[in-house]
Amino acid sequence: MKLCITSLKNQKEFELINKLGEKFYERYFILVIAKKLPKIFLESKYNTFLGIKVSRKLNKKAVVRNKIKRRIRHLMRIIVNDSNFKAIKFAIIIIPKKGFEEINFSHLQYELSKIILRNIY
């Protein structure tokens, strides 16, 4: 079964997940994972809510920041549609750190999936 991912749309949703979620600090990114979601998220047809914060500190060029966002979205699609992933509702905010754009894709996938799978169940 293919699971659906939707993005967090406004500042209120980001603040809510920041308040309810648990933070995990890694070498290349910071994760905020909220397993207990408020009613507005539970009524949705989507299983996974994704928020991405890419600061201008990371890179001044919008092209590079957008590439980082595309990589993160693709990583999440791979992780959520993996056979080991169970369909539970959760929200996640990913904040990349310096050096994120230089790391190869397979290493990022391994790191991100390890952290997400370990902390949402």
Swiss-Prot record:
Q: Which GO terms describe its cellular component?
A: ribonuclease P complex
Q: Which GO terms describe its biological process?
A: tRNA 5'-leader removal
What quaternary arrangement does the UniProt entry report? Consists of a catalytic RNA component (M1 or rnpB) and a protein subunit.
Q: Which family does it belong to?
A: Belongs to the RnpA family.
* Any Pfam family hit: Ribonuclease_P
Report the catalytic activity: Endonucleolytic cleavage of RNA, removing 5'-extranucleotides from tRNA precursor
Known EC number: 3.1.26.5
The protein in question is named: Ribonuclease P protein component
Q: Does the keyword Nuclease apply?
A: yes
List UniProt keywords, sorted A-Z. Endonuclease, Hydrolase, Nuclease, RNA-binding, tRNA processing
The record's annotation in InterPro entries points to:
Ribosomal_Su5_D2-typ_SF, Ribsml_uS5_D2-typ_fold_subgr, RNase_P, RNase_P_CS
PROSITE patterns, A to Z: RIBONUCLEASE_P (PS00648)
What is the originating organism of this protein? Rickettsia prowazekii (strain Madrid E)
Name the cystine pairs: none
Residues in the signal sequence: none
Q: What molecular functions are annotated in GO for this chain?
A: 3'-tRNA processing endoribonuclease activity; ribonuclease P activity; tRNA binding
Q: What role does it play? A: RNaseP catalyzes the removal of the 5'-leader sequence from pre-tRNA to produce the mature 5'-terminus. It can also cleave other RNA substrates such as 4.5S RNA. The protein component plays an auxiliary but essential role in vivo by binding to the 5'-leader sequence and broadening the substrate specificity of the ribozyme.
